[in-house]
A protein has these predicted regions:
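A post-motif C-terminal structural segment
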Residues: 1-5, 10, 58-401
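Structural beta-strand segments of beta-rich domains
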Residues: 407-413
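Surface-exposed, short loops/turns at beta-strand junctions within beta-sandwich domains
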Residues: 419, 454-456, 461-472
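Conserved aromatic beta-strand anchor motif in extracellular beta-sandwich/beta-rich domains
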Residues: 426-430
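Solvent-exposed serine/threonine-rich low-complexity stretches and specific carbohydrate-binding patches
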Residues: 436-455
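Short, aromatic- and glycine-rich surface loops/edge beta-strands on solvent-exposed regions
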Residues: 470-482
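C-terminal low-complexity, Ser/Thr- and acidic/Pro-rich disordered "stalk" regions positioned immediately N-terminal
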Residues: 481, 487-524
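C-terminal membrane-anchoring or membrane-association module
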Residues: 533-561
Length: 561
C-alpha cells in the first residue's frame, strides 16, 4: 500500500473522518459506506453546496455526495457519454443498481440532493439508468423528475439562477472546465529556454471570460452564486450552511507538467477565496483553505539536469521563474529523440509533502500546528454541531420508520428517518417464512456496497411491485449499514393509498431535531447568528477550507491521482 494518497482517499478523510484506501470514496477499509459532511449537515437541517472546476463525479466533489469502492464509477454506464457501457470495468458489480446496489456516483449525487451543485461532467448524465425506479431514463431526466433546477453548459442561465425552493444542478462543461491560462509544455534542459522565457496567456475558452451578455463562470463567479443561493435558502438562513469549493485543475495541470495551467488555476482559486471572504461574515462563518495532497512541481533556481522544466517570464517584473517536474514513473529520458513531455494526464505523481492549511472564523483555533486530514472533518463537524460519534449517528437513525404504500397499482417500501446511515438493507418475508424480496439478493447483500442508498432527510422508496400482494401480511426488516439500527414490522399490504410519497422530496419527521440534539455544538450559534462553513481546497500545497465550505482540489480518473 502506498504511503502517498490519491484524491479519493484524501477527500474521503476530511469528508467522513475515516481513513480509506486509494481509489475509494467514503467507505471504510471493508467497503462499508460512511456518512459524509454533506449528509450530516443535511441531517442537522443545514443548507449544503458543492462547487468544482472538475467533473462533478471527480474524486474531491464526489467525496461529498457518494460512496463507491471505485472512484471511476461515474455513472450507471460507467465512465462514458452514454453511447457505450463500460460499467463492468469501472464499477464494482454489487454497487450497480441493476444488481441491487446503491448506484453510481452520478445517481448518488441526486440521492444526496445538495442544495447547490456546480461543476463539469455534464456528458456523464446523458447515460441511461439501468436499474431502480428511474430505469430507462437518462440521469439528466432523472434529475428533472426529482425536482432539480438544471443548467447544462449555459453561463447566462447559471448567472440568472435565483433561489426558488429547488436544488440546483448546474454542469458547465461535458468534462472538466477549461483552465484560465493556455497550456505550457515542460521540456528537457535547454539553454534556449532561458533566453526566451514563456509568458502565460489567457485561454479563450475559459468560462471566466465575459461573454456577449457580460456574464462569466470563473470559480469566483460560481462561488458567489453558490453562497447567494445558500444564504437565500430558508435552511441556510435559519441554520447555516456547508459549502465545499474545489479548484480542481491545479492538480490536474501539475499531473500534465503544465506550469501556466497550474498558475492560472491557483489564481482562480485565490479569487474564489476573496469572493468568499467578501460574501460572508467571519463572525458567523468558518473558512478553511487547504489541499488534499502535495505534488511534483517546484520553483527552482535553474533548469535541472534530472527533470523536465518550464521557464516562465514574470508578468510583474520580467524575472525568470523556472518550474521543475520530476516525479513521473515514465522513462522520460530513455529516448533522446523525445525532448518534451507528452502531456499524458497523470504522468506526474503526487508526493507526501506536508500541506498548508489556514482558517478564519469560528472554530479556526482548531486549525493549529501539525494536523491530520481526518481532523478537518472534526473541525468542520464540531463547528457546525454535527454528529461525529457512533452513538450520535445511531441517534440520527433512532427515529427510523417505514411503511408499505400502494399507488397507481405499484407497491413501495417507503423508509424515512434513517439519517445516521448512508445505506440500508431490507428483507420482506411472507407468512410461510419465505423471503419474497431482499436488497441485492442473498449473495450481493453480503457486499457492503450493495443495498439501498439512503436519501438523507427524505423518503427513500423501494419498489415492491410484483413482490407483495394486496391484503396479505408480511414481515419487513430494515437495517442501517453503518449504525446497525434495525426495525422489524408486520405489515398488511393495503389497497391504493391516498397519501402521495414522492421519492427524493424532503420529508418531515425528526431528522433535523435528531441532528441538532445528537451532537455537541458549542459553536452552533454566535449570539443569534447562524454558523456557516466554507471549505476551499486544491490538489496542491496551497489551498483552503471554509465552514460555509469552499474547496479546491482535483480527484481524477486515473489510478495514481
Amino acid at each position: 500500500m502506498t504511503p502517498v494518497t490519491d484524491s479519493a482517499a484524501s477527500g474521503s478523510a476530511w469528508a467522513t473522518g475515516t481513513k480509506t484506501y486509494n481509489n475509494a470514496l467514503d467507505v471504510d477499509v471493508y467497503g462499508t459506506p460512511q456518512m459524509n459532511l454533506t449528509e450530516l449537515a443535511k441531517a442537522a437541517g443545514k443548507a449544503t453546496g458543492n462547487v468544482t472546476t472538475s467533473e462533478i463525479q471527480d474524486a474531491t466533489p464526489a467525496a461529498q455526495m457518494s460512496h463507491s469502492t471505485l472512484r471511476s464509477c461515474y455513472g450507471p454506464q460507467g465512465k462514458t457519454d452514454g453511447s457505450s457501457n463500460n460499467a463492468a470495468d469501472q464499477c464494482e458489480v454489487a454497487q450497480l443498481k441493476e444488481n441491487g446496489g446503491i448506484g453510481s456516483i452520478s445517481e448518488q449525487m441526486l440521492d444526496t440532493r445538495a442544495d447547490v451543485t456546480i461543476g463539469g461532467g455534464a456528458k456523464y448524465l446523458h447515460q441511461t439508468v439501468q436499474g431502480g425506479e428511474y430505469a430507462g431514463m437518462t440521469v439528466w431526466d432523472q434529475a428533472k423528475a426529482m425536482g432539480y433546477e438544471t443548467v447544462e453548459k449555459d453561463v447566462d442561465a447559471l448567472n440568472a439562477l435565483q433561489y426558488d425552493g429547488k436544488p440546483v444542478l448546474a454542469l458547465m462543461a461535458d468534462g472538466n472546465l477549461q483552465t484560465q491560462f493556455a497550456p505550457s509544455v515542460a521540456t528537457k534542459k535547454d539553454p534556449a529556454k532561458d533566453e526566451n522565457p514563456i509568458t502565460c496567456s489567457t485561454n479563450p475558452d475559459w468560462l471566466g471570460n465575459k461573454n456577449a451578455n457580460g456574464n462569466s463562470a470563473s470559480l469566483a463567479d460560481m462561488t458567489r452564486k453558490a453562497i447567494d443561493l445558500l444564504e437565500a435558502n430558508p435552511n441556510g438562513q435559519s441554520n447555516g450552511f456547508f459549502l465545499q469549493v474545489e479548484g480542481a485543475s491545479i492538480d490536474k495541470q501539475d499531473h500534465n507538467a503544465n506550469a501556466c495551467g497550474q498558475i492560472g488555476e491557483t489564481d482562480d482559486l485565490d479569487k474564489a477565496i476573496s469572493a468568499a471572504l467578501d460574501k460572508v461574515d467571519l463572525n458567523e462563518t468558518l473558512i478553511i483553505v487547504t489541499a488534499d495532497h502535495a505534488h511534483t512541481s517546484q520553483i527552482v533556481e535553474e533548469q535541472p539536469n534530472y527533470a523536465l522544466s518550464t521557464v516562465l517570464k514574470s508578468p510583474v517584473d520580467g524575472a525568470k521563474i523556472t518550474v521543475a517536474y520530476g516525479t513521473s514513473p515514465d522513462q522520460m529520458y530513455a529516448n533522446d529523440d523525445a525532448p518534451k513531455f507528452d502531456e499524458v494526464e497523470s504522468s506526474m505523481s503526487h508526493t507526501g509533502t506536508q500541506l498548508r492549511i489556514a482558517a478564519s472564523g469560528p472554530g479556526a483555533q482548531r486549525v493549529n500546528g501539525l494536523t491530520d486530514q481526518t481532523d478537518n472533518f472534526y473541525t468542520i463537524a464540531k463547528t457546525l454541531g454535527l454528529a461525529t460519534t457512533a452513538d450520535e449517528y445511531k441517534n440520527l437513525s433512532a427515529g427510523m420508520d417505514f411503511s408499505v404504500n400502494v399507488k397507481d397499482g405499484k407497491a413501495s417500501l417507503d423508509v424515512a428517518g434513517l439519517n445516521g446511515d448512508a445505506s440500508f438493507t431490507y428483507t420482506v418475508t411472507d407468512a410461510a417464512g419465505q423471503v419474497v424480496a431482499q436488497s441485492g439478493g442473498t449473495e450481493a447483500d453480503a457486499d457492503p456496497i450493495s443495498g439501498v442508498r439512503v436519501r438523507t432527510t427524505q423518503t427513500t422508496s423501494v419498489d415492491l411491485t410484483d413482490k407483495v400482494a394486496e391484503g396479505k401480511a408480511y414481515k419487513v426488516t430494515v437495517t442501517g449499514r453503518q449504525t446497525g439500527t434495525s426495525l422489524e414490522k408486520e405489515i398488511q399490504i393495503p389497497a391504493e393509498t391516498t397519501s402521495e410519497v414522492i421519492p427524493g422530496k424532503p420529508t418531515g419527521g425528526n431528522a433535523n431535531a435528531a441532528g441538532n440534539a445528537s451532537a455537541a455544538s458549542p459553536l452552533g450559534k454566535t449570539g443569534v447568528a447562524i454558523i456557516g462553513v466554507v471549505v476551499l481546497a486544491a490538489a496542491l500545497v496551497s489551498t483552503g477550507l471554509a465552514v460555509r465550505t469552499i474547496k479546491s482540489r482535483r480527484f481524477g480518473s486515473a489510478e495514481r491521482r
